[in-house]
Every structure is written in structure tokens, then in C-alpha cells.
Regions:
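Fe(II)/2-oxoglutarate oxygenase catalytic core
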Residues: 1-144, 152-184
Length: 184
């Protein structure tokens, strides 16, 4: 059963993906070819399997409906097709997703809301941290988190010390015509 935990504009959904579906995804990921990008130590898996795509699409739709309900807005739906496998030693420095003014993966003009779906928890390190809010999140497999991309929600990911950290990241654009996103 899904369970939501909210703190300001940060929401964690536990059990977004069932343990059975996580096991199916992990089996597929373990046997899939890894892709790389220049100057990036992480590996990427483009999900080609119909059953796995169905699992990820269902999770994405659940995320979308929860985001729209919580923020009272309509958001872009980019879909999911890429899993990121993080390398030991990887970390993500303190940053804000909206500052970059980069389009979303789906081509929407900006990143108002960020989301992460966690497909593993058999790792040490790799915690999502919001230092200014004193929030530290140790993810669990099957959970998801979403939060506004504004300066108030600057965050980082601690160095991955061991294990396998698998995620699907998404960026959502507010399509309702408002400049800022906030939960009333």
C-alpha cells in the first residue's frame, strides 16, 4: 500500500512500486547492456522490455497524479525509459534544479518539480540531502520523492560508498501558467 510523507514541498511516496515489480525490474536491469556518456562515470539502461516499461509508466502516472493533486496544477508528463546506475564514489554537489533553466527530458521549457524513483536500496551512501532544511533521505527500493526545483530546495547527494544505486529521475514543468509552484 502506498504511503505519503510530506514535509513542506517535499513528498516521499513509499511503495510506489511493489517489491515484486522491483524484483522484475532488477532482473531486467542486471542483464541489460549499459550505456555511457562522455565525462560521466554513471551507466544508463534504456528500458526496452514491455513489462518493465509498463511498470515504470504506471509509476510515472501515479507520480504525475500525486504531483498535480498536491500542487494543484497540471504538469508535463515525460514518461520514463532510462534507469541510471550510479558508480561507487559518485556524488552530486549542492545545487538547485530550476536555476539551470534546462528543459525537462520531455522537452518542456523548465524544471519546476523534480522527482526520483528509487529502484534499489542495497547501497551505502547516496543519500539525498537538503542541507538548508536539515532533511536527510535514505531511500528505499520502490519509493519515490518529489520536490520543487526552487532555490529554497537546494539539495545534494552524498558520495556512494558501496553497492548499486538505481534511479529514474524526472523533471516536471508546471503547465498551469504560474511562475512558481507551492503547496498551499
Amino acid at each position: 500500500m502506498m504511503r505519503k510523507i510530506k514535509f513542506r514541498n517535499i513528498t516521499i511516496i513509499n511503495n510506489l512500486i511493489t517489491p515484486q515489480d522491483i524484483a522484475k525490474l532488477r532482473k531486467y536491469i542486471d542483464y541489460s547492456p549499459l550505456q555511457t556518456e562522455e565525462n560521466n562515470p554513471n551507466k544508463f539502461i534504456n528500458v526496452q522490455d514491455n513489462e518493465c516499461n509498463t511498470i515504470l509508466s504506471k509509476a510515472q502516472q501515479l507520480l504525475k497524479s500525486n504531483i498535480e493533486e498536491d500542487f494543484g496544477i497540471s504538469v508535463s508528463d515525460e514518461g520514463i525509459g532510462t534507469v541510471v546506475k550510479f558508480s561507487v564514489g559518485w556524488e552530486l554537489p549542492y545545487h538547485c534544479d530550476q536555476w539551470s533553466n534546462l528543459p525537462t527530458y520531455g522537452g518542456a521549457p523548465k524544471r519546476d518539480i523534480s522527482s526520483i524513483i528509487y529502484l534499489s536500496d542495497d547501497f551505502r551512501g547516496g543519500e539525498l540531502v537538503f542541507p538548508d532544511l536539515d532533511v536527510f533521505i535514505q531511500p528505499t527500493a520502490g519509493s519515490a520523492i518529489y520536490f520543487t526545483g526552487t532555490e529554497e530546495y537546494m539539495h545534494q547527494v552524498t558520495p556512494l560508498l558501496s553497492g548499486t544505486r538505481l534511479t529514474c529521475t524526472g523533471f516536471w514543468c508546471n503547465l498551469s501558467g504560474y511562475d512558481n509552484v507551492s503547496i498551499p
